């Protein structure tokens, strides 16, 4: 058994009786500002067929009125203290999660912390979801769907069905279907909200030039009234099966100006419970080295004027859209008329790495670059503006075991909408 990963003692972590988890950290860069996040550990993959698009729709509705901030109150309140809608105030829905952020909040404004925490609170459990507002938002979603209906999006949706046969990951893109968006009953959205927006699936992250003790006390007070539904539904993490024969998925679109070839070699994903010890860090380092060395090989090949591809990459990570399956992922952008040759080159390089590994000099170059980037990150850790997002990703989304954190302790998303 490897020892646990050392945790940052400056991150205050707690869990309320209702199941909500919070992460709070002081960081004085930028000075006088703070970031507030709420993570919902649910996304479009949990939608039933007649709910496709509701996770994303609900995200939009969070800016259309809450109990304490009716109408346009959320936006008006935050803009009054210097937070800009879109730039500082935003949200996203992905297949597995939904995240809301309030960034660059000036701490010099009286009541700013309270306002932001109450907005997070109302997003978590006090949306109004008025019928008239829902109907207005249907048109907004339609326009977003129209703008996102690109050749790449259409092809991705087409191949996903083949890559995930009989699996929700094959058709649960956050934007949903316009048939559902146009016709779902008002109560369907309210039922979805009450079923899934609940404390055990939520996390609060506050990072910035703050007093940690004061913010923690406010979180405990403000969020304590959130309640769990009776007989809460299980949050299922849908597995992805292996396939006995290679899956070949082809898609074409008249608007797509160049081709892309992907190769995936699936393997088991790292279980969440195994992500809290040093073995996971060692594996993460090995993956980083693999990606850098493969990247160097592919870049060198692409520089040859006779190369059949313009660019290529190989790494190890998630299998396309699914967090529940890992894969060695490779892609190339072939030159015109050279798709088969480019595919063969990619496959050859993946096999060469598998069978023969890498040279010592390749490893030393990759390691030197990696250590240099680590040193830079360490030296700039106090100035890292995205610290709140890092905490969110590592702890809230990778489900680091809470009981391993201790009472004092303690980051594309794919297919975003």
Predicted features and spans:
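Mature N-terminal segment immediately following signal peptide/propeptide cleavage
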Residues: 2-37
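Short, surface-exposed beta-strand/loop micro-motifs that present aromatic residues
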Residues: 11-13, 21-27, 190-195, 245-253
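Beta-sheet entry/capping signal
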Residues: 21-22, 201-203, 260, 327-329
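Active-site-adjacent, His/Asp/Glu-enriched structural segments that form or flank metal-binding
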Residues: 30-32, 40-155, 173, 183, ...
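Scaffold signal of the M16-like zinc-metallopeptidase fold and its non-catalytic homologs
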Residues: 64-66, 91-96, 112-119, 123, ...
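An aromatic/glycine/proline-enriched structural segment found at the starts
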Residues: 203-259, 368, 372-378
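Extended non-catalytic domains of envelope/secretory-pathway proteins
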Residues: 213, 282-283, 287, 328-333, ...
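Structured mid-domain segments that build the active-site/substrate or prosthetic-cofactor binding neighborhood
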Residues: 261, 268, 280-360
